[in-house]
UniProtKB/Swiss-Prot annotation:
The name this protein goes by in its record: Photosystem I P700 chlorophyll a apoprotein A2
Membrane protein topology class: Multi-pass membrane protein
Family: Belongs to the PsaA/PsaB family.
InterPro entries: PSI_PsaA/B (IPR001280), PSI_PsaA/B_CS (IPR020586), PSI_PsaA/B_sf (IPR036408), PSI_PsaB (IPR006244)
TM region(s), chain numbering: 46-69, 135-158, 175-199, 273-291, 330-353, 369-395, 417-439, 517-535, 575-596, 643-665, 707-727
Organism per entry: Vitis vinifera
Residue positions binding [4Fe-4S] cluster: 559, 568
Gene name tied to this protein: psaB
Cellular localisation: Plastid, Chloroplast thylakoid membrane
Reactions performed catalytically: reduced [plastocyanin] + hnu + oxidized [2Fe-2S]-[ferredoxin] = oxidized [plastocyanin] + reduced [2Fe-2S]-[ferredoxin]
Length: 734
């Protein structure tokens, strides 16, 4: 009996129902709630699991490299990146008939293969990899790192190597390690790789370990560094006629500030990228040495925060008490980390397409669409997680005495003002945006399109103009040839930048109009509503006027029983649950907008987006319906094509999504009755009744069923859109 799952909770292990299994899985990673957990063991478990996480990441990336080297066509892709389709891996599928085998045999492969839409080929090519042998070497190296990570994780669980709690709470040393050690040194190392391997590679020079010490990255070597003539490293950059990967038109510069894109690859100049990473390395190496560690010099985080008291008294005691609050709360730290990572991930999505860093990736339209969508959805999940852990912090870790009248306490004190302002903004955006869309729909339905309300986004156009876009006719800042800003940058980075901003073949500063104005406000509605739900969930997590003792019920509770009306659906978990639906909806609008705008740009018919995006029927008919034709007809009685797998996934995604509603709409009683009927039938059926179970089958709890429903809704939603996105883009552009 003692060994029953879950071993970390004796109470659950003795539960006689199937609740034991589901609750066990649900709380397996909630180390804080486990029996006889100590603060020390908590920190050590989390620390060790980080190494496990790293091992999985290294193993996964190793697998990417290995499969492309084994089954891909990297070497032939390198010869002609614009016309050879990159292969991710082979497909072994006994279900394939002859038509399917033919349809999926592409990219010069001997059998059926999957095409890569992840951009790894462009990335590996840009950083200097050229042969399958290079890929195998990389795969082996990552496998080695994976093994090292596993060993490190195991080692730090052994008594001799277990770090103490004080080690984990040494904030200054951690900043030193992360800022200088991880960000600084890795950025410097990456600059080194770009300068020594990638840039020579882009100029036709193959640098590997055997000639690494013989090939000078710059003709003058380290001379200019030691004599202070750093500008020499920027002289003689690659010319605009440079053919990437060859010496034709190549220069000798290694650290430049050219601005704009390489004309052939349509990606940022590698020498600009190296310069950027060197600057980042310098900033982080300095930043990591600003805090007091072993030598008694530098800032103490605690002293900094204690001193942050605004002189006017408007923020009370300012940051007093925050150091201990944050440093002693893992949830607060995780919330901060997730919020930062979520913002960064969304920024990655925006910058990967507008300022592509990898050679030729801008011309691989399906990859561009897939990467944008992928990073935006991940950002959404990470951001909602940040608020979830913020709410858990308020329930489990927040100490009112420690934070009296500081910024954290004051935020809780005026939460009503925060929540009601967010509510007002959401209502305003929602009614006005929907009102405009619906008005325009009615005008089109009644045959008077000229009566639409179309608003030009003049402020956004002015901002684009200030950064150098000339087509709107605002003569301002960088779009004004007489301004000081224009003249200051004219000889350095501006020619490349201005050329890129005003060139209509890339995605930098797309021309915007009334359709963009409307969808921008629809997205703003989604963002504000998602934020409203998340912020309210966190600020009301400890208690509200309706339920002042809420924190005593924990993070996720269904209700406080039948005797106390109105306590259902108000746990912090419920807020997270509701917010995820809004998050998915919002990112749906974001990705619809991005994709439709770009499809029309790539096809050269931007007027379709401009004319149809100002009313809802335009979105439904000219974006969703028009682009789903390949999916709706993916496989039929007359055969199939290479899009059929996406057509199947489109259907399957809808199925998973719809299954979610089965868990979201019906409640426990229905399932409990059904389960008891099925158990009765099972026990009376010959042969079947030979199989017995130890746990009495019971329905999922309300919170669990919501989680299962939410998971199906999310996964189905994303599967459906992924299939639509990849099929509609690759079907048009190959």
């Amino acid at each position: 009996m003692a060994l029953r799952f879950p071993r970390f909770s004796q109470g659950l292990a003795q539960d006689p129902t199937t609740r034991r299994i589901w609750f066990g899985i649900a709380t397996a990673h909630d180390f804080e709630s486990h029996d006889d957990i100590t603060e020390e063991r908590l920190y050590q478990n989390i620390f060790a699991s980080h190494f496990g996480q790293l091992a999985i990441i290294f193993l996964w990336t190793s697998g990417n490299l290995f499969h492309v080297a084994w089954q891909g066509n990297f070497e032939s892709w390198v010869q002609d990146p614009l016309h050879v389709r990159p292969i991710a891996h082979a497909i072994w599928d006994p279900h394939f008939g002859q038509p399917a085998v033919e349809a999926f045999t592409r990219g010069g492969a001997p059998g059926p293969v999957n095409i890569a839409y992840s951009g790894v080929y462009q990335w590996w090519y840009t950083i200097g990899l050229r042969t399958n042998e290079d890929l195998y070497t990389g795969a082996l190296f990552l496998l080695f790192l994976s093994a090292i990570s596993l060993i490190a994780g195991w080692l730090h669980l052994q008594p001799k190597w277990k770090p103490s709690v004080s080690w984990f709470k040494n904030a200054e040393s951690r900043l030193n390690h992360h800022l200088s050690g991880l960000f600084g040194v890795s950025s410097l190392a990456w600059t080194g790789h770009l300068v020594h391997v990638a840039i020579p590679g882009s100029r036709g020079e193959y640098v590997r370990w055997n000639n690494f010490l013989d090939v000078l990255p710059h003709p003058q070597g380290l001379g200019p560094l030691f004599t202070g003539q750093w500008n020499l490293y920027a002289q003689n950059p690659d010319s605009s006629s440079h053919l990437f990967g060859t010496s034709q038109g190549a220069g000798t510069a290694i650290l430049t500030l050219l601005g704009g894109f390489h004309p052939q690859t349509q990606s940022l100049w590698l020498t600009d990228i190296a310069h950027h990473h060197l600057a980042i390395a310098f900033i982080f190496l300095v930043a990591g040495h600003m805090y007091r560690t072993n030598f008694g010099i530098g800032h103490s985080m605690k002293d900094l925060l204690e001193a942050h008291i605004p002189p006017g008294g408007r923020l009370g005691r300012g940051h007093k008490g925050l150091y201990d609050t944050i440093n002693n709360s893992i949830h607060f730290q995780l919330g901060l980390a997730l919020a930062s990572l979520g913002v960064i991930t969304s920024l990655v999505a925006q910058h990967m397409y507008s300022l592509p860093a990898y050679a030729f990736i801008a011309q691989d339209f399906t990859t561009q669409a897939a990467l944008y969508t992928h990073h935006q959805y991940i950002a959404g999940f990470i951001m909602t997680g940040a608020f979830a852990h913020g709410a858990i912090f308020f329930i489990r870790d927040y100490n009112p005495e420690q934070n009296e009248d500081n910024v954290l306490a004051r935020m809780l004190d005026h939460k009503e003002a925060i929540i009601s302002h967010l509510s007002w903004a959401s209502l305003f955006l929602g009614f006005h945006t929907l009102g405009l869309y619906v008005h325009n729909d009615v005008m089109l339905a009644f045959g008077t399109p000229e009566k639409q309300i179309l608003i030009e986004p003049i402020f956004a156009q002015w901002i684009q103009s200030a950064h150098g876009k000339t087509s709107y006719g605002f003569d301002v800042l960088l779009s004004s040839t007489t301004g000081p800003a224009f003249n200051a940058g004219r000889s350095i980075w501006l020619p490349g930048w201005l050329n890129a901003v005003n060139e209509n073949s890339n995605s930098l500063f797309l021309t915007i109009g009334p359709g963009d104005f409307l969808v921008h406000h629809a997205i703003a509605l989604g963002l504000h509503t998602t934020t409203l739900i998340l912020v309210k969930g966190a600020l009301d997590a400890r208690g509200s006027k309706l339920m002042p003792d809420k924190k005593d019920f924990g993070y996720s509770f269904p209700c406080d029983g039948p005797g106390r009306g109105g306590t259902c659906d108000i746990s912090a978990w419920d807020a997270f649950y509701l917010a995820v639906f809004w998050m998915l909806n919002t990112i749906g609008w974001v990705t619809f907008y991005w994709h439709w705008k770009h499809i029309t740009l790539w096809q050269g018919n931007v007027s379709q987006f401009n004319e149809s995006s100002t009313y809802l029927m335009g979105w439904l008919r000219d974006y969703l319906w028009l682009n789903s034709s390949q999916l709706i007809n993916g496989y039929n009685p007359f055969g199939m094509n290479s899009l059929s797998v996406w057509a199947w996934m489109f259907l399957f995604g809808h199925l998973v999504w719809a299954t979610g509603f089965m868990f979201l709409i019906s409640w426990r009683g229905y399932w409990q009755e059904l389960i008891e009927t099925l158990a009765w039938a099972h026990e009376r059926t010959p042969l079947a009744n030979l199989i017995r179970w130890r746990d009495k089958p019971v329905a999922l709890s309300i919170v669990q069923a919501r989680l299962v429903g939410l998971a199906h809704f999310s996964v189905g939603y994303i599967f459906t859109y992924a299939a639509f996105l990849i099929a509609s883009t690759s079907g048009k552009f190959g």
